[in-house]
Swiss-Prot record:
Superkingdom of origin organism: Eukaryota
Cellular localization per UniProt: Nucleus
Protein name (record): Probable velvet family sexual development regulator CC1G_12219
InterPro entries referenced in this protein's UniProt entry, alphabetically: Velvet (IPR021740), Velvet_dom (IPR037525), Velvet_dom_sf (IPR038491)
Gene Ontology cellular component terms for the protein in this record: nucleus
UniProtKB keywords: Nucleus, Sporulation, Transcription, Transcription regulation
Domain Velvet: 1-121
Function noted in UniProt: Velvet-domain-containing protein that probably acts as a positive regulator of sexual development.
GO biological process, one term: sporulation resulting in formation of a cellular spore
Induction / repression: Expression is up-regulated during fruiting body formation.
Length: 165
């Protein structure tokens, strides 16, 4: 069995048939340098993708490849691959179904202390349900009367609060 066949077989076992869609659902930095950290008294090289996002809803497995860019010639931007591994399966929710953020793990907090650019959350942030949402201001689409300044200011405050300002 060739290396490519083994990779395809592994991906098939985890999430079904391999994705053949040529559209890349990833957004952000897909190529990074490692961070040297100390975790549980041991030093480790960790590759933390702090700003990587998936644009599509569904179940995914990421493939990680390590290349030594100093060892290769880089002809046509291709460097020899030193190692390949796969991450665990994960689910990307639609905006409507997203349950909220979990509190950061100890690993994430350690990465932040050692200089990796990751988001750290002390507490779980749940998504507000419709009962908790601020009431919407209802008004006709077209009006000849001047807008009430209090309603405009109140809706502006709510918009900024939702946007995180």
């Amino acid at each position: 069995m060739s290396n490519t066949d083994a990779q395809t077989s592994f991906a098939s076992l985890v999430v079904g048939p391999p994705v053949t869609d040529p559209i890349n659902p990833l957004m952000g930095a897909t190529s990074i340098s490692p961070n040297l950290i100390e975790l549980h008294g041991r030093k480790a090289l960790v590759f933390a993708f702090g700003n990587l996002a998936v644009r599509a809803e569904g179940d995914f497995v990421l493939r990680y490849r390590v290349a030594d860019i100093l060892a290769g010639t880089g002809i046509d931007g291709v460097f020899p691959i030193q190692a390949i591994c796969y991450g665990g399966p994960f689910h990307v929710f639609s905006t409507k179904d997203f349950p909220g953020y979990e509190a950061s793990t100890e690993l994430t907090k350690t990465l932040s202390v050692w200089g990796a650019q990751v988001n750290v959350r002390e507490h779980r942030r749940r998504r507000r349900g419709k009962k908790d949402a601020a009431p919407a201001v209802t008004k006709p689409l077209y009006t000849t009367a001047p807008l009430d300044r209090d309603i405009v200011a109140d809706s502006e405050r709510r918009r900024r609060r939702r946007a995180g300002y």
